[in-house]
A protein has these predicted regions:
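Acceptor-substrate binding/catalytic loop of class I
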Residues: 32-37, 231-246
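Short hydrophobic/aromatic beta-strand or adjacent loop that forms the aromatic wall/cage
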Residues: 42-45, 268-272
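N-terminal juxtadomain amphipathic helix
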Residues: 1-77, 263
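Conserved SAM-binding loop
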Residues: 88-230, 242-257, 274-276, 332-333, ...
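Fe-S ferredoxin-like electron-transfer domains
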Residues: 44, 52-118
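Terminal amphipathic helices with adjacent charged low-complexity linkers/tails
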Residues: 261-269, 278
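Hydrophobic, well-ordered beta-alpha structural blocks that scaffold small-molecule cofactor pockets
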Residues: 88, 273-416
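General small-molecule cofactor/ligand-binding pocket signal
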Residues: 14, 154, 260, 367, ...
Length: 416
């Protein structure tokens, strides 16, 4: 068996734990015909003691080059992106270029690229910039959708050998364009690096195409959030790398970037503003080699499994049934790693592309909320972090007879 090696620095990995019967994917849902061959997988969670990165020792999901977004157009997300763009422009205003070219790496259908419209750098007209923005996305269907919306979106993936030749940035307010004729002034990337089996190559691409002193605004999910909340069901194969601020800093500095600013946004996401520097001048941050304690995460897994088992025993004694609302990655993991998979009647989810298919590993049918009228249940467990109260309101408004509404709070199922 080949020795386990870190996907960031190539050093040896140490296994922390194995999570059993995990979904192979958070985005690919089997059809009825595929159930006979589709199954869960065991995921080995490891840590590199050299750079500190916690990662799964597995192949990346087949679609790791594609950006798949849900909820990208919410008012909360729009306000956050606009705030980040304004901050980036405030730093670019210190440079000489008044028409900066800004590239998004991994753009999806342009949900976030479109949010540049109306963003201004400063009320002082002498400092105001005209940002020319463009994006690259691997999945053709998403590129075509973004182009149809009038965005400067191109098919591609940020890796060695990919060229930006022939591309143009677009000033969204005026519709004016500017060709990419040299190096870029800035780049942005939102929650994409954690999917990459070779993050160093992606960052090397960014470094090669930025001007010296150019900026890179980067976000990734925070592994510290999972540790703090002891939430094992937040782990998923799609996120092959689980970055802390320290392990991310180690990686970006190795690629020639200096950290300008960092913060945690939305409680669960790391945001770095980086600057391209001479590699010889970069601070050499190194991990102290401390082993991450995931004991609390494993305790959380056992406690949730026990509470769910106890709850379902009570349900069976009353001759009642349960459904789950939310085919989120958290919901998929809970279903495949607990007794829920044996008792839940079906999963309700509002995403049309999931409906009519089945949950990976647990093989439960995914349906629209209207299915409740054909097959009513006595209670519904909501597993959709961030949307629990909204969904509870929909259940109480639309479903009759109204079932009991439950949610997972910490390590226990509670009625709302």
């Amino acid at each position: 068996m080949a020795e386990k090696r870190c996907l960031a620095c190539g050093e040896k990995l140490e296994e922390l734990a194995v999570f059993h019967n995990m979904p192979k994917s958070a985005q690919e849902f089997p059809t009825k015909e595929e159930l006979a061959t589709e199954k869960g997988m065991d995921l080995s969670l490891c840590q590199c003691r050299s750079c500190g990165l916690v990662q799964f020792d597995t192949e990346a999901v087949p679609y790791y080059k594609d950006v798949i977004r849900a909820g990208g157009g919410s008012s909360t997300m729009k306000a956050l992106r606009e705030d980040e763009y304004k901050k980036l422009l405030s730093f670019l205003a210190k440079k000489e270029e008044k028409r900066p070219l800004i590239l998004e790496l991994g753009t999806g259908a342009g949900e976030f690229l479109a949010m540049w419209s109306g963003v201004e750098s400063d009320s002082d007209t002498n400092k105001k910039l005209e940002p020319y923005v463009l994006g690259i996305e691997h999945k053709r269907e998403l590129v075509e959708k973004g182009q149809a919306a009038g965005l400067a979106l191109y098919q591609g993936f940020p890796e060695s050998g990919f060229s930006l030749e022939g591309m143009e940035g677009k000033h969204l307010q005026s519709g004016k364009t500017r060709p990419v004729e040299g190096l870029l002034d800035a780049m942005v990337q939102f929650n994409f690096l954690e999917h990459q089996p070779n993050p160093g190559e992606m960052l090397s691409f960014a470094y090669a195409h930025l001007k010296m002193g150019g900026y890179f605004l980067l976000t990734v999910p925070s592994f510290q959030y999972i540790l703090d909340h002891r939430s094992y069901y937040e782990l998923l194969r799609d996120h092959i790398a689980n970055y802390s601020e320290e392990s991310l800093l180690c990686l970006v500095q190795d690629q020639g970037f200096s950290l300008v600013e960092s913060r945690v946004i939305n409680r669960d996401t790391i945001e770095f503003l980086l600057e391209k520097s001479e590699k010889e001048s970069c601070t050499a941050f190194r991990s102290l080699g401390q082993k991450v304690d995931i004991g609390p995460i494993l305790e959380n897994e056992r406690a949730i499994q026990e509470d769910i088992k106890k709850h379902l025993e009570g349900l069976r004694q009353k001759g009642e049934r349960m459904a789950v609302w939310g085919a989120s990655h958290q919901g998929l993991t809970l279903l495949s790693t607990t007794a829920l998979q044996e008792e839940v009647a079906y999963i309700i989810d509002s995403a049309p592309f999931k409906q009519g298919k089945y949950s990976p590993a647990s093989h439960l049918p995914i349906v629209d909320k209207s299915h409740f009228q054909k097959e009513p249940v006595e209670e519904i467990l909501i597993v959709a972090p961030g949307y629990t109260e909204e969904i509870a309101g929909i259940i109480r408004r639309d479903l009759r007879p109204c079932p009991r509404v439950l949610a997972l709070r910490g390590e226990k199922i509670e009625e709302l």
